[in-house]
From Swiss-Prot:
Molecular function GO terms recorded: ATP binding; ATP hydrolysis activity; identical protein binding; zinc ion binding
Binding site for Zn(2+): C444, C447
Disulfide bridge map: none
Reported effect, S793R: Prevents ATP binding and disrupts the communication among the other ATP-binding loops. Prevents also Rad50 dimerization. Decreases both ATPase and adenylate kinase activities
Organism of origin: Pyrococcus furiosus (strain ATCC 43587 / DSM 3638 / JCM 8422 / Vc1)
Coiled coil: 257-588, 629-735
UniProt: ATP binding residues: 12, 32-38, 60-64, 140, 763-764, 791-796
PANTHER family, sorted: ABC TRANSPORTER ABCH.3
Name the UniProt record assigns to this protein: DNA double-strand break repair Rad50 ATPase
Cofactor: Zn(2+)
Domain Zinc-hook: 399-496
Length: 882
């Protein structure tokens, strides 16, 4: 695999970065925090998202303030170019882009469906994730793990050399062996449970024969029993039906005899009731004849009473309306007189209004000028309140003093800021010197002479004293800087407050000059007179508007008065006509009419009484007809009932001849005994059939178990063969894992020896790698003897860790064409960093493409291509150096 180009947008500090990689050693150089390692993380995300690395999360790698992240990679594998494009949306999964294509001719074509899952599956086949992460990509911290412990070193070796596949195979084969043993045990348990299967089959077959014989015996006697029971059931049913029919006929006969008695009683009562109705009819006919003789007087009474009611009602309404109309006429006449007086008043007020308007026109100019002066005086008052007790000269002087003080404070703050930066650098240098001095062995890194414990302690004491003094001074300077910045903020606020007051002072001076040139007393007097006249004008106009509104009502009132006078004349005419109609009936007054009505009223009351008799006669005649009809129907029903009684008595006599109670009881008892016997036999047969089916089912299961027993015996033989084969494989995997690890570690030891010898200028002749159970132990050979890692100085330990890790990658160089190293020199001293350049030129150039990330400028000499990354305004910038 070889990387060609990486495009990254909005990934951590990378806003828009494009990097092209070439064959040979590609050095990415830059200060810590510039975005070098972030570029490698972007490559990892582009190739293998979603990752199994905990510290790379989508919502965290998107650049602050950006909504999405874009990564585009072009790489070559086995002569084919591939391109992966990904776009991530912060906080969302929908809308993301994941695409992988290969170059066919001059056209990019998809190799998978455009999804993260499909690309991951394809990449796992093309370049497995573990191979890339362990063999190709040497991350920060892996060298520390090599030096941490024998167990941690074994884990790194296992991951890089992909020895986990042997461990996985060993575990899976062990699990398979356990499964086979469990299966064999299960099958042997089955054989033990079914050992007496033949005896059980024989016993069930004999029991089945016995049950079938018993069923056959019952089936022989059942038909005759069923036939006899059916015959008895029919005979008993016939006798029961006859008995029921006799009982029904007796009940019906008794009912019809009761019906006969009821009808005879009804006929007697109806005849008596009819006689009474005929007597009542005769009396009512006499009363009806009297109605005809008094009918004329009744009609006269009703006509006069109706006229009286109509006369009184109309007279009351006319007189009431006439009174209302006369009252309205008087009221409107008074209102018209009042409106005529208001017309004169309105003309007088109009003349007064004209005089006031003339006076207002003369005073208007002074009034306007007075309003302007009032506004200026109010403005002057407000401005003076803002200014307080200070003069414009005082404010100007204060501002000049504040500006001078601000300049002095800013100069002091800038000097302190510079001193703080110098002290921070000094503190950093002192900490580095202390750490290097603690780790240093042999020569003193300060003076170059031999480093004794006494000399080390003397230097450390001096450095710590200087460090504490610098920290104390730094703390005081930071406090003083904070104090100065607070004072600057206060001064800025005071300047901001005072500056507008200069403008206020100028406005006050201008307004006072304008007010001094006018005759304020005269203008104020005229303005007061203007306001007084204006108020009088408003009052007059209100009164005039009120009078005008009232005068609008005059014409409608005059029209309404004429209409009311006409209506009064009409009502008087109607009243006269009503009295004329009373006289036409022969009465001079209402009293005469009342006298005549009292005379006719007694006749009318008698008429009403007789009128009820006529209605009652009609009702009585209808009741007589109805009684006659009822009597006739009752005689007909009586004849029918007597005929029914005769027929039922005859039928009952015939039924009693067919039925014998003793015979019925005897046959019923015989039937019940036979039914019990039949039920017992059928239940016995059903139970035997159920037992038969159970035995058959048991036999089928036993025979199936017998067949299964033979199959299980064969399965056990096959499983025992598989178990033997699995045990052989487990031993082979175990041996091959040990051989593969030993062979790899032997070669890695040789390569590590060469590289470490370069680092130490031949001080150590060999690196010994020894594999143990879950451990990889490292030794160095010095003066012909193996020495543990504790024998090495701090710098030598770091060099050994780097040499060992490079050796593992070089061991895999025949299989890989790309190596990525992230910060391989963080703890190397200057001499060993120079040695690393020689190692890179000798060993790393064997790999077709190397990408090396470092902040160490010295490595440029060994690189074929140099790319510099720097941080500007929070974004990473890329520059191709060579």
């Amino acid at each position: 695999m070889k990387l060609e180009r990486v495009t990254v947008k909005n990934f951590r500090s990378h806003s828009d970065t494009v990097v092209e990689f070439k064959e040979g050693i590609n050095l990415i150089i830059g200060q810590n925090g510039s975005g070098k390692s972030s570029l490698l993380d972007a490559i990892l995300v582009g190739l293998y998202w979603p990752l199994r690395i905990k510290d790379i999360k989508k919502d965290e790698f998107t650049k602050v303030g950006a909504r999405d992240t874009y990564i585009d990679l072009i790489f070559e594998k086995d002569g084919t170019k591939y391109r992966i494009t990904r776009r991530f949306l912060k906080g969302y999964s929908s809308g993301e882009i994941h695409a992988m294509k290969r170059l066919v001719g001059n056209e990019w074509k998809h190799v998978t469906e455009p999804s993260s899952k499909a690309i991951s599956a394809f990449m796992e086949k093309l370049i497995p994730y573990n191979i890339f992460l362990n063999a190709i990509y040497i991350r920060q911290g892996q060298i520390d793990a090599i030096l941490e412990s024998d167990e941690a070193r074994e884990k790194v070796v296992r991951e890089v050399l992909n020895l986990d596949k042997f461990e996985t195979a060993y575990k899976k084969l062990s699990e398979l062996k356990k499964t086979i043993n469990n299966r064999i045990k299960e099958y042997r348990d089955i054989l033990a449970r079914t050992e007496n299967i033949e005896e059980l089959i024989k016993e069930n077959e004999q029991e089945l024969i016995q049950v079938l014989q018993e069923i056959s015996k019952i089936e022989e006697v059942l038909p005759s029993k069923r036939s006899k029971v059916d015959m008895l059931r029919k005979e008993v049913l016939r006798l029961e039906e006859t008995k029921v029919e006799i009982e029904n006929s007796e009940r019906l006969l008794e009912k019809r005899r009761g019906d006969k008695r009821t009808l005879e009683e009804r006929i007697k009562n109806t005849e008596e009731y009819l006689e009474k109705l005929k007597e009542k009819e005769k009396e009512l006919e006499e009363q009806v004849k009297e109605i005809t003789s008094i009918k004329k007087d009744v009609d006269a009474y009703l006509a006069l009473k109706e006229f009286k009611n109509e006369y009184l009602d109309k007279k009351y309404k006319i007189e009431k309306e006439l009174t209302r109309v006369e009252e309205l006429i008087n009221e409107i006449q008074k209102r018209i007189e009042e409106l005529n007086e208001k017309e004169s008043e309105k003309e007088k007020l109009e003349n007064e209004k004209k005089e006031i308007l003339n006076k207002l026109a003369i005073l208007e100019k002074d009034h306007q000028l007075y309003e302007e002066i009032k506004a200026k005086k109010e403005n002057l008052r407000q401005l003076k309140e803002k200014l307080g007790d200070k003069s414009p000269e005082d404010i100007k002087k204060l501002l000049e003093e504040l500006e001078t003080k601000k300049t002095t404070i800013e100069e002091e703050r800038n000097e302190i800021t510079q001193r703080i930066g110098e002290l921070k650098n000094k503190i950093g240098d002192l900490k580095t010197a202390i750490e290097e001095l603690k780790k240093a062995k042999g020569k003193c890194p300060v003076c170059g002479r031999e480093l004794t414990d006494e000399h080390r302690e003397e230097l450390l004491s001096k450095y710590h004293l200087d460090l504490n003094n610098s920290k104390n001074t730094l703390a005081k300077l930071i406090d003083r800087k904070s104090e100065l910045e607070r004072e600057l903020r206060r001064i800025d606020m005071e300047i901001k407050r005072l500056t507008p007051l200069l403008t206020v002072a100028e406005q006050i001076r201008s307004i006072e000059e304008e007010l001094n040139v006018v005759n304020l007393e005269k203008i104020e007097k005229n303005a007061t007179e203007y306001e007084k006249l204006l108020e009088e004008l408003r009052t007059l106009e209100g009164r005039i508007r009120g009078l005008a509104e009232d005068l609008k009502k005059l014409a409608p009132l005059e029209k309404k008065l004429a209409a009311l006078i006409h209506k009064k004349q009409e009502l008087e005419k109607e009243l006269k006509e009503l009295n004329t109609k009373l006289e036409s009936f022969g009465f001079k007054s209402v009293e005469d009419l009342d006298s005549k009505l009292r005379e006719l009223e007694e006749i009318y009351k008698r008429y009403l009484t007789l009128l009820n008799s006529k209605k009652e006669l009609e009702i009585t005649q209808r009741e007589i007809a109805k009684a006659k009809e009822t009597l006739e129907m009752s005689f007909e029903e009586l004849a029918e009932v007597e005929a029914d009684i005769e027929r039922i008595e005859k039928k009952l006599s015939q039924l009693k001849q067919k039925y014998n109670e003793e015979e019925y009881k005897k046959k019923r008892e015989e039937k019940e005994e036979l039914e019990k016997e039949l039920a017992r036999l059928e239940a016995q047969k059903k139970e035997l059939e159920k037992r038969r089916d159970t035995i058959k089912s048991t036999l089928e299961k036993l025979k199936a178990e017998k067949e299964n027993r033979e199959r299980v015996k064969k399965e056990i033989k096959d499983l025992e063969k598989a178990k033997d084969f699995t045990e052989e494989l487990i031993e082979k995997v175990k041996k091959y894992k040990a051989l593969a690890r030993e062979a790899a570690l032997s070669k890695i030891g040789e390569l590590a020896s060469e590289i470490f010898a370069e680092f130490t200028e031949g001080k150590y002749s060999e690196v010994v790698v020894r594999a143990e159970e879950n451990k990889v132990r490292l030794f160095v050979v010095w003066e012909g003897k193996e020495r543990p890692l504790t024998f090495l100085s701090g710098g030598e330990r770091i060099a050994l860790g780097l040499a060992f890790r490079l050796a593992m990658s070089l061991y895999l160089a025949g299989e890989i064409s790309l190596l990525i190293l992230d910060e391989p020199t963080p703890y190397l001293d200057e001499e060993r960093r120079r040695k690393l350049i020689t190692i890179m030129e000798r060993y790393l150039k064997k790999i077709p493409q190397v990408i090396l990330v470092s902040h160490d400028e010295e490595l440029k000499d060994a690189a074929d291509h140099v790319i510099r990354i720097s941080l500007e305004n929070g974004s990473s910038k890329v520059e191709v150096v060579s």
